[in-house]
């Protein structure tokens, strides 16, 4: 256990984030437990943080003893869509609640889930502010400030917890706040050719965006047999191809690790539970040869 904690504390190793679907509150198999995940995962993101079952809270403590952190997401774009859907069905609400009021209330509601967790991953795509009118940019900046300042206020009051950002840091107007994030998780779900990885990252190399903390997000294959594209780059598994790419040095930015979406899909493998995830980790962080 101590060796495991030391390994996690080592800043040099490539980090592994794992998004886990914890919607099942009466688990019928080991696949539905976060304690079944490979020990060398650094950060587990739970997709459903609001009503944790007792067994989940206990398992978070078990993971913490292994040096694994557990987090959840607050998603700016989802909150915006939620507000727009509400206004489209009940237009009279627009007079009572602006988006900014709705946003602040929703963030505060979701921050209340944070007590058992070690950190929060802010999901933010937003829009490119370069092409906005002065009025639109002012409104966009005000909404952003609410989203980020509310969570930064939370982190300042919760020593030892962390914030990461998943999405597009280049669309953040006030780039000064970006230094507060542990990692930027860059979504590579749409990449279909491993040679296009460097191209996909070019958009992120913008003045003011720290380039020393990039994590690449890809998915495991879907459990739906008819879906042959999710989790694949060409014919190969995306997590494996991405791991190999992460091990190759880049001049302009640091590849700090991988984020695996829907990690639980890799549990049942003929050659052992989480076989592909373990291979991914081993490619990035090979066990020292004896």
Roles of regions detected by a PLM:
Residues 1-12:
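Bacterial Sec-dependent N-terminal signal peptides
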Residues 5, 100, 104, 275-282:
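Generic detector of well-ordered alpha-helical segments enriched in charged/polar residues
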Residues 5, 32-33, 246:
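Generic recognition of flexible, low-complexity loop/linker segments
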Residues 11-202, 211-220, 224-227, 271:
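Chitinase-like catalytic core of GlcNAc-active glycosidases
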Residues 205-207:
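A conserved mid-domain beta-alpha-beta active-site/ligand-binding segment of alpha/beta enzyme cores
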Residues 212-290:
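Substrate-binding cleft of secreted/luminal carbohydrate-active enzymes
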């Amino acid at each position: 256990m101590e060796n495991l904690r030391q390994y996690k504390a080592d800043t040099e190793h490539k980090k592994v984030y794992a998004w886990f679907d914890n919607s099942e509150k009466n688990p019928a198999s080991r696949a539905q437990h976060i304690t079944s995940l490979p020990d060398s995962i650094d950060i587990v993101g739970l997709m459903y943080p609001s009503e944790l079952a007792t067994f989940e809270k206990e398992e978070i403590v078990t993971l913490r003893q292994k040096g694994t952190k557990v987090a959840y997401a607050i998603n700016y774009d989802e909150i915006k869509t939620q507000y727009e859907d509400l206004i489209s069905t009940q237009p009279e609400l627009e007079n009572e609640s602006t988006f900014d009021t709705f946003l602040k209330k929703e963030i505060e509601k979701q921050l209340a889930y944070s007590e058992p967790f070690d950190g929060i991953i802010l999901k933010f795509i937003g829009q490119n502010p370069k092409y906005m009118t002065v009025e639109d940019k002012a409104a966009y900046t005000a909404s952003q400030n609410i989203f980020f300042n509310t969570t930064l206020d939370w982190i300042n009051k919760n020593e030892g917890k962390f914030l990461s950002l998943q999405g597009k840091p280049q669309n953040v107007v006030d780039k000064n706040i970006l230094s507060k994030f542990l990692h930027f998780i860059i979504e590579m779900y749409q990449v279909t050719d491993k040679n296009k990885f460097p191209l996909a990252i070019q958009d992120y190399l913008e003045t003011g965006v720290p380039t020393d903390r990039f994590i690449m997000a890809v998915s495991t294959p879907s459990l739906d047999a008819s879906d042959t594209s999710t989790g694949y780059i060409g014919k190969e598994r995306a997590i494996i191809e991405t791991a190999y790419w992460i091990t190759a040095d880049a001049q302009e930015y640091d590849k700090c690790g991988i984020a695996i979406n829907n990690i639980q899909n890799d549990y049942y493998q003929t050659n052992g539970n989480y076989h592909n995830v373990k291979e991914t980790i081993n490619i990035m962080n090979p066990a020292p040869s004896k």
